[in-house]
Structures are given as C-alpha cells and as structure tokens.
C-alpha cells in the first residue's frame, strides 16, 4: 500500500511538473525569473507531502488540460489590455484632461479614516472616468478573470473594478474585500506588476483575501514612457 501510494504521488508530481514545464515554455521570455521557477518545478517530485497544496495551483488530468487553455490565452489578453490602457492615457493627455507630469506624479495624498490606507493622486479622478469601461469589458468577456486593473510603478491602483469599489461601510472586514481601490499593493507580487518591462509576467500567489490566484501583467507605456502595468488576476 505504501509503495502504491508513493507511485501515485510520483505520477501526480510528474503531471504537475509537466504542467509547470508547459507554462514555463509559454513564458520563456520571462528570462531569469522563468528559469528559476522551472528549476524549482523540476524538484517537485520529491515534495509529495505538499501535493495537496500544489494541486490546488496546478490541476491534474482533464482539469489540468482545461486550465492550460486558460493560461495560454492570457498573455495576448493582458498585452492587448495594456496597449489599450496606454492609448486611453495618451488620448487624455492629448485632449488636455491632464498633463504627463500629473500622470507620473507619485506624491499620493492619504485619504483620511481609511484602513488599509487609501490615497488620492493627481490622476485618479481621470482614471475613475476612463478605466472602468476597459476593465469591465475584459471582466465581462472572460469569466475566469477575477480582477483587471491598472497599476503604476509603485503598486498604486487608482481605480479598481466596480465589484471591488463598493461604498465604504466602516466595517474593516467588509471594506477590505469590497473596496480595494486607491490602495498601494506593495506585496512582492503587487510590486512587480507595475515595475517589470517584460512582455508579460505570470505570478501565482495567495491573495491577502486567502484565495490562490494567478496574476499576469504587462507594461503600460504612455508616449514612450513606462507608466506601470496592466494586471489581470484569474483562476485556472
């Protein structure tokens, strides 16, 4: 029975490694980060004790194949979203709705009586007007997507999705989940989303709300300058 269990774990680990290899092939352009992740993935066969947790991220069998179809379509979606977001910001600057200096200003102003702390900026009133249509359209057409947001290079998200921009209630637990707009997400994953300039970056992490999430981001450029990133969180 023990030998059979070991063989089963080994087969499951092989499947997980296979899926990770596929993902790493897809994101090979992620350079050193991808190579490090692939190196770590090849050692998963020795981590049978963690298979239950690992399998929550990399699904097996038919479910795993279905998940791979989701992973494979995300790079094109996020890069197109980043391109459109950059165009929206360029059009706003060209139309005199704000200056380039306003958009790249990071002297955020704390919004009183908010916890976690929220911030206003010289550009969030604009993004509140122009981001929701783009972000909402992507959410509506991709049911596996949980969030689709723009972030500057510091992890500041000026305008979150409507589902995560509910009116503040004063109840910390409710607001923590229901209103995530205008926060600086400076966790290790959030910091990378706006800083990197790779074609796209896929990260898998446990969200601060407890969910395991895949996050893919692509850089947003405005008149040739790197403003931040377009960030998509999805389940697969």
Specify the residue positions occupied by each region the protein language model found:
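Acidic, heptad-repeat coiled-coil helices used for dimerization/signal transmission
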Residues: 17-20, 24-120, 141
């Amino acid at each position: 029975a023990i030998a059979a269990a070991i063989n089963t774990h080994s087969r499951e680990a092989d499947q997980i490694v296979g899926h990770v290899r596929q993902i790493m092939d897809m994101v090979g352009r992620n350079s050193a980060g991808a190579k490090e992740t692939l190196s770590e993935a090849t050692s998963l066969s020795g981590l049978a004790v963690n298979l239950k947790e690992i399998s929550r991220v990399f699904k097996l069998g038919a479910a795993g194949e279905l998940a791979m179809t989701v992973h494979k379509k995300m790079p094109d979606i996020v890069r197109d979203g980043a391109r459109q977001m950059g165009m929206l910001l360029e059009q706003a600057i060209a139309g005199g709705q704000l200056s380039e200096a306003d958009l790249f200003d990071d002297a955020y102003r704390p919004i009183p009586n908010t916890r976690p702390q929220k911030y206003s900026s010289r550009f969030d009133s604009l993004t509140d007007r122009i981001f929701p249509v783009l972000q909402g359209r992507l959410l509506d057409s991709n049911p596996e997507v949980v969030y689709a947001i723009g972030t500057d290079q510091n992890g500041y998200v000026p305008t979150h999705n409507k589902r995560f921009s509910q009116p503040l209630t004063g109840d910390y637990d409710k607001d923590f989940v229901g209103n995530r707009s205008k926060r600086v997400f400076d966790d290790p994953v959030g910091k990378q989303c706006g800083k990197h300039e790779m074609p796209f970056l896929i990260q898998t992490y446990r969200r601060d709300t407890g969910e395991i999430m895949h996050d893919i981001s692509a850089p947003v450029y405005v008149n040739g300058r790197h403003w931040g990133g377009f960030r998509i969180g999805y389940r697969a």
